[in-house]
UniProtKB/Swiss-Prot annotation:
Native organism: Psychromonas ingrahamii (strain DSM 17664 / CCUG 51855 / 37)
Cited CDD domains: UreG (cd05540)
Gene3D superfamilies with a match to the protein in the record: P-loop containing nucleotide triphosphate hydrolases (3.40.50.300)
UniProt KW Repressor keyword: no
UniProt entry keywords in alphabetical sequence: Chaperone, Cytoplasm, GTP-binding, Nickel insertion, Nucleotide-binding
Positions with a binding annotation for GTP: 13-20
Protein name: Urease accessory protein UreG
Family designation: Belongs to the SIMIBI class G3E GTPase family. UreG subfamily.
One GO-annotated biological process of the protein: urea catabolic process
């Protein structure tokens, strides 16, 4: 059976920014509409893959956890072979896949996805790290296709200004889109889905 062309969506961001929570919400919202799968990257465990399975985000055979060992950004940039093999495996299992989400291991602001691994890149940062994060720059913040500023509900608790983050993000990204989000309440989720569907030419 001939496999259809597959959209690959990279999801990057620092540890704890909310990447796995975003994946879970995207799976729950889109799994009945699209044929989809997920590849997660963890340094020594399959924790993120297990989280998605436990939360019934997708059927178990649609999720593969890659143990990257050592440096997580090597697996998404310099040597993407493990991730490409995982995508191929999922595509063999599900020849009609519309897209696969590839979650990077927790990385720093300089990590980027190899073009052969990701057609569309989402980068997640979170407000709890402070409102200075957007102006620190780095490829994830300046060059990702969509920047997601997550956990806006904790802004007051950590003394972060969303206005400052909005201003600095516009300065760093120019015309590139970004969205403020709170995955607990699904705030911003509709905009993220619309971006994926539009830019990924799914609709």
């Amino acid at each position: 059976m001939r496999k259809k062309q597959l959209l690959r969506i990279g999801v990057g961001g620092p540890v704890g920014s909310g990447k796995t929570a975003l994946l879970s919400q995207l799976c729950l919202a889109l799994r009945d509409k699209y044929d989809m799968a997920v590849v997660t990257n963890d340094i020594y465990t399959h924790e993120d893959a297990q989280f998605l399975t436990r939360n019934n985000a997708l059927a178990e055979d649609r999720i593969i956890g890659v143990e990257t060992g050592g440096c997580p950004h090597t697996a998404i940039r310099e040597d993407a072979s493990m991730n490409l093999a995982a995508i191929d495996d999922l595509h063999e299992r599900h020849p009609n896949l519309d897209f696969v989400l590839v979650e990077s291991g927790g990385d720093n602001l300089s990590a980027t996805f190899s073009p052969e691994l990701s057609d569309l890149t989402l980068y997640v940062i979170d407000v709890s790290a402070g409102d200075k994060i957007p102006r620190k720059g780095g490829p994830g913040i300046t060059k990702s296709d969509l920047l997601i500023i997550n956990k806006i509900d904790v802004a007051d608790l950590v003394g972060a200004s969303l206005e400052v983050m909005d201003r600095d993000t516009k300065k760093m990204r120019g015309d590139r889109p970004f969205v403020f989000s709170n995955m607990k309440t699904q705030q911003g989720l509709a905009e993220i889905i619309d971006f994926i569907e539009t830019e990924g030419m799914l609709k």
